[in-house]
Amino acid sequence: MRIIVSIGGSVLAPDLEAGRVEAHADAIDSLVADGHEVAAVVGGGDVARQYIDSARDLGATEYDLDALGIDVTRLNARLLVTALNSSAIPEPAESHEDARASMRRGEVAVMGGTVPGHTTDAVAAMLAEMVEADLLIYATSVPGVFSADPNEDPSAERFDRLEASKLVDVISSIETTAGSNAPVDLLAAKVIERSGLRAIVLDGTAPERIADAVDGDPVGTEVLPNE
């Protein structure tokens, strides 16, 4: 299979802990060893938010804040490249075209953000669309997609599976609720819907769940193309 794995920055390296990065690299290496084509997109996490908060206090524009966040995602991506044993791209790709070219060469493409205004959630969905991926995995800090933000609404229920149109509706509702956080952003959800991508949103704090998802084990929430 052709697989795109999106790893949240706070999941990959919450405290820049080498062991965590290595565990995620091992998960990707195992997919490659099983014959899959793999690319990884890495987020910025708490480190990016700390830089952004400081820069905002210093008067940076929203564009500059986005650019700063992208820089951090690429640093995290470079950490992952360093940990990979498989034939990873020598340095993080800075565009979808570069990542696609890397995959065509048989490399593991690794990238962070691309342009201001696009989260790494969206970057991963766009890459999956571009390379016609068989599966898009979001390794997040939550165990799937819920009917509402479970941190804000204790009655929120997790979906085992849902169609992409329902994902768009759920994410749209969560993003318009003050203080709530969605497991993937709305642009990513819309790209998933328009492309008919199959996606799985899972708790990536245990990296082995990535391989479990590829093997078809019931982990997280499966997003299916609209009927």
From Swiss-Prot:
It is an enzyme of class 2 (transferase). Signal peptide: none annotated. UMP binds at residues 44, 66, 114-120. ATP binds at residues 9-10, 45, 49, 140, 146, 149. One of its GO terms (molecular function) is ATP binding. It holds the Pfam family AA_kinase. GO terms for cellular component: cytoplasm. Inhibited by UTP. GO terms for biological process: 'de novo' CTP biosynthetic process; UDP biosynthetic process. Its EC number is 2.7.4.22. Pathway: Pyrimidine metabolism; CTP biosynthesis via de novo pathway; UDP from UMP (UMPK route): step 1/1. It catalyses: UMP + ATP = UDP + ADP. Keywords: ATP-binding, Cytoplasm, Kinase, Nucleotide-binding, Pyrimidine biosynthesis, Transferase. InterPro entries: AceGlu_kinase-like_sf (IPR036393), Asp/Glu/Uridylate_kinase (IPR001048), Uridylate_kinase (IPR011817), Uridylate_kinase_arch/spir (IPR011818). It comes from the Archaea. It is found in: Cytoplasm. Belongs to the UMP kinase family. NCBIfam families: pyrH_arch. Homohexamer. Catalyzes the reversible phosphorylation of UMP to UDP. This is Uridylate kinase. It comes from Natronomonas pharaonis (strain ATCC 35678 / DSM 2160 / CIP 103997 / JCM 8858 / NBRC 14720 / NCIMB 2260 / Gabara) (Halobacterium pharaonis). The gene is pyrH.
